Regions:
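Non-heme di-metal
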Residues: 1-181
Length: 181
């Protein structure tokens, strides 16, 4: 995190970052544990893992907000792109080299495969940031097929409607329709 806050350079900043990381990791672990419990027929235990995961998510959000890690959408997209860039250019590259040096060639290959996905994530976030900055999220220079994410209403045009004529949801529910089947 590169933003300067009242905690910058303090042990409290380190503690907040550790609390955020710990709560975030716990949330993920509990969702994985819930999947196992569900597969083994323990619905209540799965539900309790998920409930606790939701609690951990909120705890993490408290600490992340305290660190001023949440901005507006453009700031968040830039932050996400920068994070993904670090992951594919530095983190996973270093992990792969170390794994290879230590004889874990299959793991090194997997680190490199994930790095390629992280590169795609960066590109996607940067494209979305461009759309936000250029006011091109809900308006394009050519005709597109727009779909309401709430009710499925289809509109053909250069711009998504302000309000869905079918379900009255706002423009924010529209996306460019894509069929990938």
């Amino acid at each position: 995190m590169s933003k300067t806050t009242k905690y910058t350079g303090t042990q409290t900043e380190k503690n907040l970052m550790a609390a955020f990381a710990g709560e975030s990791q716990a949330r993920n672990k509990y969702t994985y544990f819930a999947s196992v419990a569900k597969k083994q027929g323990f619905e209540q235990i799965a539900a309790l893992f998920l409930k606790t995961a939701d609690n951990e998510k909120e705890h993490a959000k408290l600490w992340f907000k305290e660190l001023e890690g949440i901005g507006d959408t453009a700031e968040n997209l830039l932050s996400a792109a920068e994070g993904e860039n670090y992951e594919w250019t530095d983190m996973y590259d270093g992990f792969a080299k170390t794994a290879e040096e230590e004889g874990f060639k299959e793991l090194a290959a997997r680190f490199r495969l994930v790095a390629a996905v992280e590169k795609h994530h960066e590109e996607r976030y940067r494209a979305l940031l461009h759309n936000v900055e250029m006011a091109e999220v809900f308006a394009k220079s050519e005709v597109k097929v727009w779909e309401c994410r709430n009710c499925g209403h289809i509109v053909v045009g250069e711009k998504a409607p302000e309000i869905c004529p079918t379900c009255n949801h706002p423009q924010s529910y529209f996306e460019i329709h894509a069929e990938n089947y």
